Amino acid sequence: MDIHIIYEHVERELYNAFLIKFELEKRGYDVFISKPHEARIPSFNAPKLIIMPWLFGEHNLVDLRVGYIRRFKKILNLQYEQVMSQMWLDVGYHISSDKARNACQLCWGNKRKRILMDAGISEDKLVVIGDIRQDFSKPAFKNFFKTRNHLSNEFNLPEEHEWCLFISSFSFATPSESSRQYIDETIGIENSKKWNEISIKSQKLILEWIEQFVRENPNQEFIYRPHPSELKDTNYLHLQKLDEKYANFHFIFKYSVQDWILNCDYINSWISTSIVECYVLKKVCNILRPVKVDEYFDIPFYINADHISDYESFKERNLSKKNNKFPIAHNEIKEYYDDIGEEEFIYKKICDYIEVVINEDSFNEDYYNHGPIIDNLKFLIGKLFEGMLLENSLRHSTFCRVCSSACSTFVHTENS
C-alpha cells in the first residue's frame, strides 16, 4: 500500500476519496480507503502517505500510530472544514497542534492559508489548491449524480411537482451528552450555551415554517436533508413523525447534498457551507434566519448576506423564482475559495501535489513519541480484551461499491 486515505462522513467525503484513489491508481499507486477508528490488525509496512479529512493533534496521531508496525513519515490533511466562525477560530478549532502541525495542509484559498500561518504553521507545509467538492459541480460530472427521475421513483416524489430543499446544519441543537461536554470544553460553557440556544430556537422556527408551508401547499414537495451529525440527535424522531404526517414532507439523508441541489427547484439553508455548491451550480439559495445569529457565531460570508427572517418571505421565495439574485456576493465567497468557477479539475491538482509529497524527502517528519512497536502492543492488548479485531467492513459496504464504481468509470473514461 502506497497511500492510505481516511474519510469520516460517507455522504460528504467518500466520492472525493474514490476520485483521488482512482486517479492515483491510474498513475501507478496502490491506494487503500478506510474510516478512522476501524478495528483492524496493524499493518507491517506503513504507507508512503496518509491522507486525513482533518488532523487536530496528538490524539489523531495516536490512532494512526497503532495502525502500522513501521513508522509513517508523511501526512496530508485535506481539512474538510475550512470556513468557520470567529468563535471556532479563537479556540484554534481545526488548526493542527503538537506534531500534527508538521503535516502538509491543503487549503481551499489564501484566506485559510493566512489563518494557518498566523497560527504558527510553516508556509512550506501549506498549499492552496481548492476544494475537491467543487469538481462535482462542473459540467463533466453532469451524469455522475442521481437524476430527478431516479429520486422521484425511489422516494415517491411526484416529478411534476416543484421540489423545495432545506440543507440542515443543526448538529449543535441537540447534541449527545458526550458531544455537549466536548463542546463546553472546547469553546467554553457560556459560548456553548448561547450557540445551543440560537440553534434550538432557529431549528424550531424553521420547522414551524416548513410545516405550515407543506400544509398550505400540498403540491410542493419539501425535502429536509439533515447534516450527517443530526442522525444521532433527539430531533430525529420528530422529523420522522413529520415525514409520516405529511405526504409532501420528506426527511431524507440518503445521497450527497449535490444530488439534491441539482434536482430541487428551490433551496434553503440556515448556515451550511454547502451554499457554495449552489453558487457554483448557479442555483439560488435562500438563507433562513428567523433568529438573528451573532456575527461571532456566524459563517463569515453569511454575515452580510440577504437573509429571510419571516414566514411570508420564506413562502414567497419557495413559490416564485422572480428573485434570482444569489444572497452572497461573489467576492465574499472568492475570499475562501480561490479556484471557484475554474475549469481545471481540483482532484488532479491534488494528485499532482500528492506525488510531489511522496517523492520529496523534505516532507518526511517524525510523528512518534515512542517506538511503533510499543504503541501497537498497547493496541493489540486493548483490542483483544474488547474483542474488536474485526474484518474491515469497508469492502462490504454497498454504498462504497456504488461510489467506487461511479468514480472509477469517470476517472478511466475522462479524456479518453
Predicted regions and their residues:
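A generic structural motif
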Residues: 1, 27-32, 217-222
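Donor nucleotide-activated moiety binding/catalytic core segment of transferases
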Residues: 36, 225-276, 280-281
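Short active-site oxyanion
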Residues: 100-105, 221, 264-266
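Short, conserved active-site loop motifs that form the nucleotide-linked donor/cofactor pocket
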Residues: 103, 126, 247-250, 305
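C-terminal amphipathic helix plus adjacent low-complexity
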Residues: 317-416
